[in-house]
Amino acid sequence: GETVAWTRTDVKDGHDLGLKVRASSTMPLFMPPTTIDGHTYMDGGMGDSWGILLNAARADGYERFCIIRTQPRGYRKHAMSRGAQALFRAAFRKHPIVAERTIARWQPYNELCDEIEQLEKTGAAWVFYPDTMDVTNKTTDYDALVRSYETGLAQAQRDIESLQTWLG
């Protein structure tokens, strides 16, 4: 449950970058863990940041934040069913912290979403929310992924002026 953030200087080459991207996006149960330099990585959204490095940016002295969300405005996670909780506990009996943090993730994630919305209201954050999200993190249909990319690109081009205004 520890957050690791890599910077440009931590990446040796394209292969190393690929490993680090995979490590940060690995989903428990759906993908195997990634091992880098003897350390096992399971999910970029499991550490203290819950996948959004707002506190790391604050620690670096930033007071304004440009945040790119992957879910529409208002999206919140829900508590896992008891059956799903039992599945995670069984699947990760050798790594109980993975199970427990995944099971409990919805509450701190939702609190972080609330905080981001507050920052946006005060002008301390500019947040890009996709108008729609027609794919999931398990989508493998190439055409659906291309359509989603094109939809997101069109929205970003539409919204760029708003970001430029916020940046001043």
Which positions does each model-derived feature cover?
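Patatin-like phospholipase
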Residues: G1-G168
